[in-house]
């Protein structure tokens, strides 16, 4: 008597639950998994992955479901959110150069080298928490007119941001972004002190990303790697009024609106096991913000000043940055796309606080900054060195 063992198709485990987003999502991934079965030669890492899956016993369905979930590329869920956040690092440093450091001449060039640590936490199922460490530089060229409060110029920045995901495998992503922009600041003719200022700016960016996705299958970590490009443009309007309360203190209430559009190209993992292909997608940001800044200056020595600024603000994302509906499929198969669950765009808004402490003179400065966002319980801190000439 001959006994034949027949492998049950992986699609038989798909179930009827809407997971991660729609009912067909798990089926489409498992269809790709089934198509990859037996493609790679014996002894390869992908064949070892299938051996791990096939070793799962009848009463160990939870292990199979966990392995399936691990392989489905949750790291690509909030690509747009991470890109948007990296761009804001440059924005923050350019703003510091523009507003926090007094210009002593009608034409100035300001450069700042900075490092920043960030953390993102969420309770949304399928979204992985992460830490990030960034370093880069910002440059600002400004030409002031004879009238106080009127100026124009351009700025540039570059940042390298390293993300470390808090998943089981310890996935990583590196992003390098370049940004270039122009701005113009105007003050009413009747405001001789230049206290009321309207600033309009436009910018564009491009970035290169390298993803190293690591995931657990039964009791072993497998991986896949990809690289991809993102790009975008933005327009910002800001209205602020500087109130000098004493020789050393000032208050600046402000309001702003920033519009941004960004997109990443299609992603196809080139190496590793159970490689995925992610469909290119975009995001748009519509972000109004209101806030107030408190500034204190204390002379320390000849031409040297201690400066501290506390900023309190409220912003609300009205665009589509988190719940972006990214899609993926198993690469090198003709399996259909499955959805990757995105972050909630809950419209709750974000209260933020930023503290900057620095020592500066007419040429050099050093600053320490720390901040907190209520949305995402985001804690950040950084250190910067700057020079003006």
Task: Enumerate the predicted regions with their spans.
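Extracellular/surface-exposed low-complexity segments
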Residues: 1-66
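Short, flexible active-site loops
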Residues: 38-53, 265-280, 289
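Outer membrane beta-barrel translocator domains of Type V secretion systems
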Residues: 49-243, 367-380, 384
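Outer-membrane beta-barrel strand-turn architecture
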Residues: 103, 143-148, 186-192, 243-247, ...
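Solvent-exposed, glycine/polar-rich loop segments of beta-barrel outer-membrane systems
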Residues: 125-130, 166-173, 208-229, 263-284, ...
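Outer membrane beta-barrel transmembrane domains
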Residues: 179-181, 274-389
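Surface-exposed loop/turn motifs in large extracellular/passenger domains
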Residues: 229-231, 248, 306
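Solvent-exposed flexible segments
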Residues: 258-262
């Amino acid at each position: 008597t001959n006994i034949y063992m027949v492998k049950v198709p992986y699609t038989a485990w798909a179930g009827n639950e809407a997971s991660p987003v729609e009912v067909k999502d798990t089926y489409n991934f498992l269809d790709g998994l089934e198509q990859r079965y037996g493609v790679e030669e014996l002894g390869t890492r992908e064949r070892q992955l299938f051996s791990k899956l096939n070793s799962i016993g009848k009463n160990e369905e939870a292990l199979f479901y966990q392995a399936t979930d691990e392989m489905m590329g949750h790291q690509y869920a909030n690509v747009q959110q991470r890109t948007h956040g990296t761009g804001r690092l440059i924005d923050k440093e350019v703003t510091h150069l523009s507003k926090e450091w007094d210009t002593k001449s009608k034409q100035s060039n300001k450069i700042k080298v900075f490092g920043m640590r960030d953390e993102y936490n969420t309770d949304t199922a399928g979204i992985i928490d992460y830490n990030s460490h960034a370093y880069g530089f910002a440059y600002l060229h400004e030409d002031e007119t004879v009238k106080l409060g009127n100026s124009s110029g351009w700025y540039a920045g570059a940042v390298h941001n390293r993300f470390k995901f808090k998943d089981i495998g310890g996935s990583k992503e590196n992003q390098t972004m370049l940004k270039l922009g122009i701005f113009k600041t105007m003050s009413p003719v009747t405001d001789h002190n230049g206290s009321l200022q309207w600033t309009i700016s436009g910018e564009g960016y491009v970035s290169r990303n390298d993803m190293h996705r690591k995931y657990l299958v039964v009791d072993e970590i497998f991986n896949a790697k990809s690289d991809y490009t993102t790009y975008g443009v933005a327009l910002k309007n800001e209205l602020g009024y500087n109130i000098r309360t004493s020789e050393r203190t000032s208050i600046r209430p402000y309001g702003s609106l920033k519009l941004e559009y960004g997109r990443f190209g299609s992603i196809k993992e080139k190496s590793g096991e159970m490689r995925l292909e992610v469909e290119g997608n975009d995001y748009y940001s519509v972000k109004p913000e209101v806030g107030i800044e408190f500034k204190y200056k204390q002379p320390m020595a000849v031409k040297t000043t201690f400066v501290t600024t506390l900023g309190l603000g409220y912003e609300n994302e009205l665009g589509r940055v988190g719940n972006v509906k990214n899609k993926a499929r198993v690469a090198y198969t003709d399996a259909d796309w499955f959805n990757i669950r995105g972050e909630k765009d809950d419209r709750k808004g974000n209260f933020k606080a930023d503290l900057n402490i620095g020592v500066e003179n007419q040429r050099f400065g050093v600053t320490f900054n720390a901040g907190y966002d209520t949305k995402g319980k985001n804690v950040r801190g950084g250190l910067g060195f700057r020079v003006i000439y």
